[in-house]
Amino acid sequence: MSLEAFHHSEPLTLGVELELQLVSTNDYDLAPYAEDMLRIMKKVPLPGSVVPEMTNSMIEISTGVCHSSSEVLGQLTQIRDALVKSADKLNIAVVGGGTHPFQQWHERRIYDKPRFQELSQLYGYLSKQFTIFGQHVHIGCPDADSALLMLHRMSRYIPHFIALSASSPYVQAQDTQFDSARLNSVFAFPLSGRAPCVLTWSEFEQYFNKMTRTGVVKSMKDFYWDIRPKPEYGTIEIRVFDTPLTIERAAALAGYVQSLAAWFLAEQPFTPTEDDYLVYTYNRFQACRFGLDAVYVDPASGDHMPLRDHILQTLDHVARYAGTHGASGALHMLRGETALGQNDARWLRERQREEQLLAEVSRQAALRFRGHDI
């Protein structure tokens, strides 16, 4: 199968996908209600889409094409409000977060869709363990070569995205000591990690063709990279975010991506090289493990610094581009919470310290997703 041509898209436009938990309001464990939710949601006119995911206790929502983080928030608000109403009819709740804090993976059931069934046959128990919940952000690129440059420039900021979105400290009722344990499940897949460092579409086509000849890859969907090109949309797709507990944070993260992308296109600040990836896995681990308290190694200079400081410096650097694209409020929110070391993983741990019951933490997270200020 040949690689699809890179389609035209408006540069710097956004699209956001969120994978969400469906939980019972009796015990706040995951509940297999995806099919019922989708049946109800089909009747509601909404922007974007609501679709099934790998197991039947999760769904994915997505926006349409948006021009700003405020437009993302507007669309997510419409979809969220409709989800909440539908869930209330079924006596279930919808929750954000990168992992459910105490579900048992072996109890999950694969959603009845051919691709999910094929993946289950291929990956065995990993498929059920893939009941994890991420946010994906698409950013429009001017052309195919620009998309690859954008992808590899964004790779330097993967630790930012992980730490700012981290919301998966608990797995099977245990505190993993990771802020983002979700990504540990992704690492198990053979085609995860990072894209090859090629900077032209013709080189990327050659790589793709080699991979398809091996029989390992049939389409771009087979790559579980942290960032991958989406030629059918004319975008790159950043896939390392945990699903935040609120749609406000999800929209703010999209605003940060857009501000970075605007800086890259306007200033072409550096040319990515293979050496950028010497510290990639280390930086990624640090962000997953320690969140905003991680260490960041600058790939260009080799300097070590607190990740929090690097995020704050970058937020300042892209502030004028945020202003141009209506993302100043989004970056202001991220700046304030970064300065305090506050991400969703910390919020979840604080609730657990207070409540000593993960079901109650999940209940409060459901209220937070609804828009309650707790």
UniProtKB/Swiss-Prot annotation:
It catalyses: L-cysteine + L-glutamate + ATP = gamma-L-glutamyl-L-cysteine + ADP + phosphate + H(+). Pfam families: GCS2. One of its GO terms (molecular function) is ATP binding. The keyword Nucleotide-binding applies. Signal peptide: none annotated. Keywords: ATP-binding, Ligase, Nucleotide-binding. Its EC number is 6.3.2.2. Belongs to the glutamate--cysteine ligase type 2 family. YbdK subfamily. This is Putative glutamate--cysteine ligase 2. It comes from Acidovorax sp. (strain JS42).
